[in-house]
């Protein structure tokens, strides 16, 4: 039954379920058999209130989904059905917390130039980082699509590897093909091919990858490897970004997902049609609009246009 969940979802649920069990144990909400299931609506309300001190309402819903999954695994009925009191508690938490929105900032073309100037591309690790950064930016990649937490966590049928890269010409390349075998919105691993053309130097993913691939070699494993042989992880990527922008005097929350947000933002600013932005980011709905960040300057200019 565990195969019905993506591996990342399974890990998230497992952590949430452990927290639920610990809460029930400490709050005296366990059944005589020692199990928290089946959970009553009142138990779920107490758990939700407990979580609200450290989690936002959207994260709390993920924890409740994990509790539902626990019940399903045990062959029990869905504990969230017809829970009117629980729904009111959730609405109250959302109203109290307010709408904070995403704090993650976009990495735009301006930020990409800052990253480039901070690196020494004759260094293996720096070149690898630049190749990964440009690929993530120009192809709107999610961090899970190009990073791996460790060598032992690498799954050939899921993660990006050297065999997933192909160029149209080794003499004068003009296009690179990237095979994404699995992603957040592709749970059945149908896969998709992404294409990358030449950019304007130094912001060119094709050029960066062409430089990196000879250093990477043809050995099996993750596409992006440090000189030590360890893979580029999301944690390492985020730490490098934080250090680079801190050294440049730029404050804010930049993460591995900032490449995707920045790509959508710059694409919209550059006048790329909505349907192309949606296709480039592989969004199945209008959710891509949530990724576009509009600066205060642009909004101010827009109001002035109303008087023309």
Question: Which residues fall in each region the model found?
Answer:
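Extended, non-catalytic subsegments within catalytic or DNA/protein-binding/adaptor domains
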Residues: 1-308
């Amino acid at each position: 039954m565990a195969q019905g969940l993506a591996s990342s979802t399974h890990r998230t649920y497992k952590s949430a379920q452990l927290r639920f069990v610990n809460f029930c144990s400490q709050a005296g909400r366990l059944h005589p058999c020692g199990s928290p299931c089946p959970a009553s609506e009142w138990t779920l309300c107490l758990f939700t209130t407990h979580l609200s001190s450290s989690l936002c309402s959207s994260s709390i819903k993920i924890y409740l989904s994990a509790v539902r999954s626990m019940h399903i695994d045990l062959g029990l009925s869905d504990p969230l059905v017809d829970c009117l009191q629980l729904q009111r508690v959730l609405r109250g938490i959302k109203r109290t917390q307010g709408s904070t929105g995403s704090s993650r900032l976009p990495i735009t073309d301006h930020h990409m130039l800052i990253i480039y100037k901070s690196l020494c591309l004759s260094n293996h690790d720096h070149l690898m980082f630049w190749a990964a950064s440009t690929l993530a930016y120009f192809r709107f990649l999610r961090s899970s699509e190009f990073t791996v937490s460790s060598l032992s966590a690498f799954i050939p049928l899921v993660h990006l590897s050297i065999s997933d890269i192909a160029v149209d010409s080794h003499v004068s390349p003009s296009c690179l093909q990237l095979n994404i075998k699995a992603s957040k919105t592709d749970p059945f691993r149908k896969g998709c091919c992404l294409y990358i053309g030449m950019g304007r130097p130094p912001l060119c993913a094709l050029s960066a990858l062409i430089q990196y691939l000879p250093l990477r070699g043809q050995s099996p494993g993750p596409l992006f490897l440090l000189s030590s042989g360890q893979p580029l992880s999301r944690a390492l990527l985020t730490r490098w970004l934080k250090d680079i922008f801190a050294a440049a005097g730029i404050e804010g929350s930049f993460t591995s997902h900032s490449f995707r947000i920045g790509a959508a933002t710059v694409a919209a600013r550059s006048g790329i049609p909505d349907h192309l932005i949606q296709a480039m980011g592989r969004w199945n709905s209008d959710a891509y609009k949530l990724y576009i960040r509009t600066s205060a300057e642009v909004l101010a200019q827009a109001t002035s246009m109303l008087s023309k």
